[in-house]
Amino acid sequence: MKTKPSAIKSLLAAALAASCLASYAAAPQKREMKFEKLRKEFADPPRAFRPAPLWVWNTRVTRADIDRMLGDFKAQGFGGAFVHPRPGLVTEYLSDEWFDLYKYSVEKGKELGLDIWIYDENSYPSGFAGGHVPAQMPESYDQGQGLALTKTALPPADAGKYFLCLKKEGGTFRDITADTGRYKDVPGEYYLYEKTYYGRSGWHGGYSYVDLLVEGVTEKFLDITMSGYEKTFGNELGPVIRGLFSDEPCIPSSGGVRWTPDLFEVFRKQWGYDLATSLPLLSEQTGDWKQVRHNYLETLTQMFVDRWAKPMSAYCDRKGMLWTGHYWEHDWPSMYQGGDNMAMYAWHQMPAIDMLFNQYNDQSPQAQFGNVRAVKELRSAANQTEIGRAHV
């Protein structure tokens, strides 16, 4: 795991529940740990220590709705809210009306002493900006995100449709993609890889989810999502709007092994050998399969860090904002959705985890509510980095 250097001196722990609650940080300050002070703050905590719900907008939002709901939040002891668009939303996402209502919410929050935070997506997973990213940047989704394997004894007549064709020769594999016709009558073991693509859906605005491993996708996402907030709030981003929440960003395969256009190039530069002719070792236990799988997963993780986490973190640093949220279910030991979650936490100003449902389960490593492992991963990442005072 590659993280920012040094360790923080202190950590206050609190649960962040992405399904309904989130706690958030105040600016670093000298703290007195006297019991009387702690007891007083437990009885009437400042808003930085109070929960903040995901405030769902899933209809036509009105100022009267905002007045009523923020009033309810204040009455129930909340410290703020994350405006969270969900399916059913009639108010157009990122429209002038959206930002007018958002600004009204922030002003009302000031009156009530509530912090209004940004949830950075139209539902989830973060990255596609409600369909605007794929609409404006086709290469964010149309190049393929997986390689599906077909094994044959002879190259098929339509071998040209495959992205990569390998022939097994002893304990190694030869790339015959450019010359499959030569082997049409040569029996053997052939490994044929075809590109797969994320499927389109209404959830993603009629497009598909985007490939966060493609360079420039995160920057496009930030430009589309945050430009309206920048125009509307200017210097209030940071001091007033404390930060933003990313929900479930992920890098799953669209079918077969996870692939992205420059994966082979990045892999060779990092490890000094060809991943293309080693792809069968990702599904078969032969040769140096353990090394190949480790190198492959480490490459995906580092690409995810470099092309998603670092740009997001840098943007929030520039704006003086806190970046929080969580990744897709952090379901270790499965690496299907994103590799090493702890490596991702290191780039958040306020790292967090999901705690779905309300049924305690300390048995399954994939459990959400009651998952001690996930909490310890999060705390360890906070302790190992220089994020300063944190609530996790």
Regions found by a protein language model. Name each.
Residues K2-L12:
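Bacterial N-terminal signal peptides that target proteins for export
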Residues A13-C20:
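Bacterial N-terminal signal peptides
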Residues A22-K30:
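Bacterial Sec-dependent signal peptides at the C-terminal "C-region" and cleavage site
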Residues K30-P45, R50, D65-Q76, G80, ...:
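Mature extracytoplasmic enzyme cores
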Residues M33-E41, D65-M69, S334-M342, F369-S380:
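Alpha-helical scaffolding within the catalytic cores
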Residues I116-S123, I241-E248, L300-Y336:
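Aromatic-lined carbohydrate-recognition surfaces of secreted/lumenal glycan-active proteins
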Residues P125-M137, P249-L263, W323-Q359:
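Substrate-binding cleft/loops of secretory-pathway carbohydrate-active enzymes
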Residues G388-V392:
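Conserved small/polar residues in nucleotide/adenosyl-binding loops
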